[in-house]
């Protein structure tokens, strides 16, 4: 269905197009008015009327009409359907111009087709022309001008009409936008003419008021020509002018207007009109400056003033004649004090006179120096300075400029003596820019002033200050610097009052003609960095890069991730302390300097705050050290006060054998061997061996010979308890038995024990082995004997033992190896070794229990008994079943004593790696 509809629409469109092409001459309708021109601000209504033929062909009526302006549909509120063939549209307060209004229909209710279109024009009717005037240029047609009034936005025609009383002249037509019209004829002088203007457009037409005039009163003469200027040698202040007037001068009387100016000036000077009111062709201008070039121009008008001034003539110039200078040059001096004391080098300087004051070409200058009442010295100088050597006295210098006519008035300058002290400076000196000039203002001193000398120079660190100067009259207290001044440069301005007796004290200040932002910013650095603060410092910017007065500095600092902080610092400061910073933190900082015209940033600088504040580590370390020192001191004092107790536990008193009374216990018992302990001790360079008992872990069974001696050890222990002592308790490791060396010399050198073994008093004969040589040496120890050795009960025990019948058997303490197969061949044996039957394991257990009980019951000498018991147990141990050998090393040296030998403690002497006495 939709495809069929599309096909029908296309066929209908082709049909309508064919019909419309064939009937272009006859549209389906029309709009009236067809050429509307609407006055702006009014209402306008257009009506579209459809023809009956179109109604039938396109099956439409007036309700199918669509209005458009410039292809934009008009709102339905403005459309009115009059009947089935007509529809109207209304526009209120029309302001548009050149709008295309079209009437369209929707054929078959869908296809839009244009029926008719018109263009709507809007505008205003013409205003009455005003200010109508006419001018008659000499030798040309009359030109009239008018004011057409407001813009009409429509095509408007202006017609200029003129007539005599009996004759009309051709019209002059012009269109809107042109305010003048040239008449096509030359008017006749002395005959009045009437002129008016008519204006017309689609909305109406108007006429101006007519004007009536004589063309001679509207004439504009041609400008004067051939203007010339000449000077006079007699008078240097006049110039003579001559010219030729226009051709009307023969018909009309003309007066002239003369103006002049100096060559470099921009404004003209008017010659009074009353001086040129009469017709003339020459004139003399007076009161001019000598030797000055002037420019002149002239124009003319009718003598009665009616009509128009002619155009200005071509300019002509002339120069007045020379005259003597009207003013003395500005005069100043500088004294160089580096010469010997009797002379001064004075530099006299002066300014060139301007042309307006020189009144001619300056040929030279005359300088006269007078010292007190002496003869004057005259110098003729072509330049503007003179260097002379003066004494330390006062001088008076005069200066005059000379040209071809004569000399200028002389200017006098007093050069005071070398001991002169200047005073009375100006006060309240100010300098400020205004109107692109640098002004200087001051308050005069109370003393009368002849003149002021103003000096200025550019301050720079790269070049010297070369001053320029100017002179001002003594009545002046405000002036501007005359010279070529630069912007963004610092000027040092000095004002010196000059009195009749000499110059006063100079007063200086700095100023800028125009300031700018600095060329570079300050460079900041750290002076001191703490934990939470940092002292920043910087240098003042060089004057060459300041470009103005530094008002303030800004310091911007931030961390790598923090917000930037900004502080402002006065321009007089060169350092600033940043506080409330974070410890051990990297900061980035830069500075900017500001003038009144802007600022400039300096380079960025980084620093890191300290982790600890200054003195914080010392505050921690010093108290700790003091506390440690105090603790140590208290400990030392405590140890000193408790030295006896400490000595008792660490270094117990060891009896000195040399002072022992043991020899007095049995004084009647002679020694078995008479020998000198010092002379005969180990005379054969043989040393007592000190052996250490080593029990191999694999030995299970004790040796039979060792088990045999267990019973003897038990019996002997009872009788010897209380008669054995070593060096200092358990640490001395002394045995309750005398030890007999039984190992070879190489074995004794291997012992590294530090315990010194003393002999033990045994009250019985030696039962096992008696060494061939019994050697005792006197102990070199200075340690006292043990307390147990000095007790009286010990002495009684010794006596009772000596008198007893039973003598305890002596036990030998030696290294023994059981005879087992495979024993190490390098193990040393004693020459005599007792063979005992193998004991049972029960005997060994009983022996250990006995040792434990003895150790608990004996507080004194327990270590010696333990060591002795370990030696006895070692003797009792035999060879295990697996054939391994148990090795015993002797830890002491046995001393063989006979039953009738006197009991005494004698230290054992060990050499070459053995035990040395303490």
Curated annotation (Swiss-Prot):
Sequence motif Box 1 motif, residues: 650-658
One GO biological process term: signal transduction
Signal peptide: 1-22
Chain positions carrying an annotated carbohydrate: 43, 61, 83, 131, 157, 205, 226, 382, 389, 477, 552
Tissues where this protein is expressed: Found in hepatocytes, astrocytes, fibroblasts and endothelial cells.
Sequence ranges of Low complexity compositional bias: 730-751
Domain Fibronectin type-III intervals: 125-215, 223-323, 328-418, 422-516, 518-612
Paired cysteines (S-S): 28-54, 48-103, 134-144, 172-181, 457-465
InterPro entries per the UniProt record, alphabetical: FN3_dom (IPR003961), FN3_sf (IPR036116), Hematopoietin_rcpt_Gp130_CS (IPR003529), Ig-like_fold (IPR013783), IgC2-like_lig-bd (IPR010457), Type-I_Cytokine_Rcpt (IPR050379)
Topology versus the membrane: Single-pass type I membrane protein
Main location: membrane
Primary role: Signal-transducing molecule. The receptor systems for IL6, LIF, OSM, CNTF, IL11, CTF1 and BSF3 can utilize IL6ST for initiating signal transmission. Binding of IL6 to IL6R induces IL6ST homodimerization and formation of a high-affinity receptor complex, which activates the intracellular JAK-MAPK and JAK-STAT3 signaling pathways. That causes phosphorylation of IL6ST tyrosine residues which in turn activates STAT3.
PANTHER family per the UniProt record, alphabetical: CYTOKINE RECEPTOR, FIBRONECTIN TYPE-III DOMAIN-CONTAINING PROTEIN
Protein name: Interleukin-6 receptor subunit beta
Organism per entry: Rattus norvegicus
Gene behind this protein: Il6st
């Amino acid at each position: 269905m939709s495809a069929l509809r599309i096909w029908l629409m296309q066929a209908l469109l082709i049909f309508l197009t064919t019909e419309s092409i064939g009937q272009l001459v006859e549209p389906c309708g029309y709009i009236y008015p067809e050429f509307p021109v609407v006055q702006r601000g009014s209402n306008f209504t257009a009506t579209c009327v459809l023809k009956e033929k179109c109604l039938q062909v396109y099956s439409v009526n007036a309700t199918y009409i669509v209005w458009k302006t410039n292809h934009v549909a008009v709102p339905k509120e403005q459309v009115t359907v009059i009947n089935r063939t007509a529809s109207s549209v209304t526009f209120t307060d029309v302001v548009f111009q050149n709008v295309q209004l079209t009437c369209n229909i929707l054929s078959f209710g869908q296809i839009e087709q244009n029926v008719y279109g018109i263009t709507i024009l809007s505008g205003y009717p013409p205003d009455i022309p005003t200010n109508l005037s006419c001018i008659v240029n000499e030798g040309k047609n009359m030109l009239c001008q008018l004011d057409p009034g407001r813009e009409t936005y429509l095509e408007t025609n202006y017609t200029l009409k003129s007539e005599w009383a009996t004759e009309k002249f051709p019209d002059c037509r012009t269109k809107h936008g042109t305010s003048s019209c040239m008449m096509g004829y030359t008017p006749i002088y002395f005959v009045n003419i009437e002129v008016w203007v008519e204006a017309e457009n689609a909305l109406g037409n108007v006429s101006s008021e007519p004007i009536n005039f004589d063309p001679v009163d509207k004439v504009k003469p041609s400008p004067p020509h051939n203007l010339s200027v000449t000077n006079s040698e007699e008078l240097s202040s006049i110039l003579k002018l001559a010219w030729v007037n226009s051709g009307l001068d023969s018909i009309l009387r003309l007066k002239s207007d003369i103006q002049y100016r100096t060559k470099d000036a921009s404004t003209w000077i008017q010659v009074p009109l009353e001086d040129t009111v009469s017709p003339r062709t020459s004139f003399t201008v007076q009161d001019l400056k000598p030797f000055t070039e002037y420019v002149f121009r002239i124009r003319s008008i009718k003598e009665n003033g009616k009509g128009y001034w002619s155009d200005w003539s071509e300019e002509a110039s002339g120069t007045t004649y020379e005259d003597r200078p009207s003013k003395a040059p500005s005069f100043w001096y500088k004294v160089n004090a580096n010469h010997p004391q009797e002379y001064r080098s004075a530099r006299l300087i002066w300014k060139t006179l301007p042309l307006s004051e020189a009144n001619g070409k300056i040929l030279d200058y005359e300088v006269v120096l007078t010292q007190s009442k002496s003869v004057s010295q005259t110098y003729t100088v072509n330049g503007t300075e003179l260097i002379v050597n003066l004494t330390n006295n006062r001088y008076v210098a005069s200066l005059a400029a000379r040209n071809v006519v004569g000399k200028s008035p002389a200017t006098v300058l007093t050069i005071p003596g070398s001991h002169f002290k200047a005073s009375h400076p100006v006060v309240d000196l100010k300098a400020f820019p205004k109107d692109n000039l640098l002004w200087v203002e001051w308050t005069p001193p109370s003393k009368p002033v002849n003149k002021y000398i103003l000096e200025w120079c550019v301050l720079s660190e790269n070049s010297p200050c070369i001053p320029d100067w100017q002179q001002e009259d003594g009545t002046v207290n405000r002036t501007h610097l005359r010279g070529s001044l630069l912007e963004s440069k610092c000027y040092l301005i000095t004002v010196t009052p000059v009195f009749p007796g000499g110059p006063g004290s100079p007063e200086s200040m700095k100023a800028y003609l125009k300031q700018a932002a600095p060329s570079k910013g300050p460079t900041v650095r750290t002076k001191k960095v703490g934990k939470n603060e940092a002292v920043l410092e910087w240098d003042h910017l060089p004057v060459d890069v300041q470009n103005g007065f530094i008002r303030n500095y800004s310091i911007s600092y931030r961390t790598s991730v923090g917000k930037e902080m900004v502080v402002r610092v006065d321009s007089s400061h060169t350092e600033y302390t940043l506080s409330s910073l974070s410890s051990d933190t990297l900061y980035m900082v830069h500075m900017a300097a500001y003038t009144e015209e802007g600022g400039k940033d300096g380079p960025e600088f980084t620093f890191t705050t300290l982790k600890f504040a200054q003195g914080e580590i010392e505050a921690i370390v010093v108290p700790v050290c003091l506390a440690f020192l105090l603790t140590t001191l208290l400990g030392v004092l405590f140890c000193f006060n408790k030295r006896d107790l400490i000595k008792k536990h660490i270094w117990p008193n060891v009896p000195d054998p040399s002072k022992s009374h043991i020899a007095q216990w049995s004084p009647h018992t002679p020694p078995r061997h008479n020998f000198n302990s010092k002379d005969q001790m180990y005379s054969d360079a043989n040393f007592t061996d000190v052996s250490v008992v080593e029990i191999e872990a694999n030995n299970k069974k004790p040796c039979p010979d060792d088990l045999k001696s267990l019973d003897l050890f038990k019996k002997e222990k009872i009788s010897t308890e209380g008669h054995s002592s070593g060096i200092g308790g358990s640490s001395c490791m002394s045995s309750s038995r005398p030890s007999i060396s039984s190992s070879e010399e190489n074995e004794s050198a291997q012992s590294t024990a530090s315990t010194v073994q003393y002999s033990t008093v045994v009250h019985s004969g030696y039962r096992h082995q008696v060494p061939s040589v019994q050697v005792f040496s006197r102990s070199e120890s200075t340690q006292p004997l043990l307390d147990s050795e000095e007790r009286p009960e010990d002495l009684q025990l010794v006596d009772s033992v000596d008198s007893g019948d039973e003598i305890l058997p002596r036990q030998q303490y030696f290294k023994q190896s059981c005879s087992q197969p495979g024993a190490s061949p390098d193990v040393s044996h004693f020459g005599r070794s007792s063979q005992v039957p193998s004991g049972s394991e029960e005997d060994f257990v009983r022996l250990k229990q006995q040792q434990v009980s003895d150790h608990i019951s004996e507080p004194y000498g327990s270590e010696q008994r333990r060591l002795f018991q370990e030696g006895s147990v070692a003797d009792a141990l035999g060879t295990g079943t697996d054939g391994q050998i148990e090795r015993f090393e002797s830890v002491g040296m046995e001393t063989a004593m006979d039953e009738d030998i006197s009991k005494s403690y004698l230290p054992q002497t060990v050499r070459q790696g053995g035990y040395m006495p303490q």
